[in-house]
Amino acid sequence: MNVTGKLRGLISFSTVLPLKSEASIEDIASLTLHWPLVGALIGVAVGSAGVAASLVFPGAVVACVAYGFAIWFTGFHHLDGLIDMGDALMSHGSFERKIEIMRDPRIGTGGLGLLLIVSSTTIAAIYSLPQGVLFQGLLIGEVSAKVCLTGCARVSRPLDGGTGRHFIMASRSPFTGMVWIFWAVAAYLLAGVPGAVSVAVAVLSGVFIGLVARRNFYWSTGDVLGASNEVGRMMSLLGLLAAIRLTGL
């Protein structure tokens, strides 16, 4: 299958956009390092929604609208992974038992707790963005979410079975670091030093989540990758805010 068909598949897989594609999961996963590009597409949509909301609503509502639009536009897929990983982190037993809990459709206190922490912090971070960088911040946040996902995949151990292993294997490319640098430079051009810091924080966050998964579950699943997307968005926004504050921009 050509790259265009695979890219359509990746966009359809990552969003609620009803694009027709015959790409298999292996075809889609082959473009794992292109995921930040899809993140940019998502970021433009989220940023536009946030700016539009800011014209008629106060800041707190704008933050809720932007975050709500982001998780809806991505089909709530990654949010589900965040909840599942939270439940597994709170469990005890063997690695296999924790993986079983992660795949359990029921929601526990660990998942709800992690969801509350990440969602509330993300909303607060969006609310704290200066109006002049609202669009840029939301755009960089979505790109960084995908960068974080690739960072997590890069250090993860694939579990036989499931979709996550295809993305993990595809991330083991000699070009992964170049992709991270490219998006850090792009973020710098968009928002200066804070933008580059945001992407760097996302990379480190992804690696951290991957290492946490290795220690707690031995393997990583699609849920772990999904969780890294949500945490990556949050951490990149926090990094952006911290850099803005420290640099006085």
Swiss-Prot record:
It catalyses: alpha-ribazole + adenosylcob(III)inamide-GDP = adenosylcob(III)alamin + GMP + H(+); alpha-ribazole 5'-phosphate + adenosylcob(III)inamide-GDP = adenosylcob(III)alamin 5'-phosphate + GMP + H(+). It is found in: Cell membrane. It holds the Pfam family CobS. Pathway: Cofactor biosynthesis; adenosylcobalamin biosynthesis; adenosylcobalamin from cob(II)yrinate a,c-diamide: step 7/7. Its main location: membrane. Keywords: Cell membrane, Cobalamin biosynthesis, Magnesium, Membrane, Transferase, Transmembrane, Transmembrane helix. GO terms for cellular component: plasma membrane. It is a multi-pass membrane protein. GO terms for biological process: cobalamin biosynthetic process. Belongs to the CobS family. PANTHER family: ADENOSYLCOBINAMIDE-GDP RIBAZOLETRANSFERASE (PTHR34148:SF1). Joins adenosylcobinamide-GDP and alpha-ribazole to generate adenosylcobalamin (Ado-cobalamin). Also synthesizes adenosylcobalamin 5'-phosphate from adenosylcobinamide-GDP and alpha-ribazole 5'-phosphate. This is Adenosylcobinamide-GDP ribazoletransferase. The lineage of its organism: Archaea, Methanobacteriati, Methanobacteriota, Methanomada group, Methanobacteria. The gene is cobS.
